């Protein structure tokens, strides 16, 4: 049984690996065309660097080990976002807007969802140095454009704002334990539990917290929220920011969910989640996390998104494409060798058989090179 992998870890076999690689190139090329520069952080870092500003969920998902050189505790990254924030704040040190993108494996102690693995291939983009809502809109459009490029339709994009709950909790004077309890109930939309937990919260904040799970749907939710929630400055600003996103990108399938508080201890502004048919959870997540670089010397405005490319690859419809071309062993035949090289230059996959090899068990070959007279031509391989 030595060949068994640990639970929720899997090999990517040739067909899946090829599909993932095509998607990776397509998405990174899309990011590059929008001015996002690629960075490649290491898999391992000192634990305090990986977990700076992170919530408790990321701490629990991070594998930990001892560095044999320094004796310090290290972590295997569970999220590349903090690493990108470190690069922006400490290494690049740009004064204006910085646009970064990345793609790499991360490792989780537990799967994030019932359908996810423990080694996602995380691909994403981050924008630093701009505090306005226009940056959030730019990142959301970048995400939507990536799905357009890989031809995976987005059914809806949920918008939320963690500042609304934070303002209510602060105004109500909730102690940390009570805030965490209410937060958990909101995330699961447990209305009876929420009513019970808020029983001793002063009015009007009690009613406002209890209303949050019902504040989801179309653009009209913002008007309902403005009428039903206390007119706290932070809430007014949050609703105005969400309204700006709806107006700024009417072509996108936006919906509002004011109780969506994923990443509450990490995000501090707009949050968003993209959903597509055939997948039970969000396929991409993002939001604003201003100040993430503070521990690295510079507190910068920041917003971005990421997704698991392995999960995305399972949802993308693969179009029919030509298989490989099977070629005989060229040996000293310079004419055949040149013809094979020319086909490869044209983008064809050509499998040249080794001396004595009669068939190829690798890429699916649907054509072959055959000598007709003095010329090598491509013929279809007839199935028996």
Curated annotation (Swiss-Prot):
- Name a single GO biological process: L-histidine biosynthetic process
One Pfam family per UniProt: tRNA-synt_His
- Report TM segments: none
The keyword NADP belongs to this UniProt entry's keyword annotation: no
Keyword Amino-acid biosynthesis recorded: yes
Biological pathway: Amino-acid biosynthesis; L-histidine biosynthesis; L-histidine from 5-phospho-alpha-D-ribose 1-diphosphate: step 1/9
Q: Where in the cell is it found?
A: Cytoplasm
Where is it found, in Gene Ontology cellular component terms? cytoplasm
For this UniProt record, give its keywords in alphabetical order, as a comma-separated list: Amino-acid biosynthesis, Cytoplasm, Histidine biosynthesis
The extra comment attached to this record reads: This function is generally fulfilled by the C-terminal part of HisG, which is missing in some bacteria such as this one.
Q: How does it assemble?
A: Heteromultimer composed of HisG and HisZ subunits.
What family is this? Belongs to the class-II aminoacyl-tRNA synthetase family. HisZ subfamily.
> What job does this protein perform?
Required for the first step of histidine biosynthesis. May allow the feedback regulation of ATP phosphoribosyltransferase activity by histidine.
Protein name stated in the entry:
ATP phosphoribosyltransferase regulatory subunit
What is the species of this protein?
A: Dechloromonas aromatica (strain RCB)
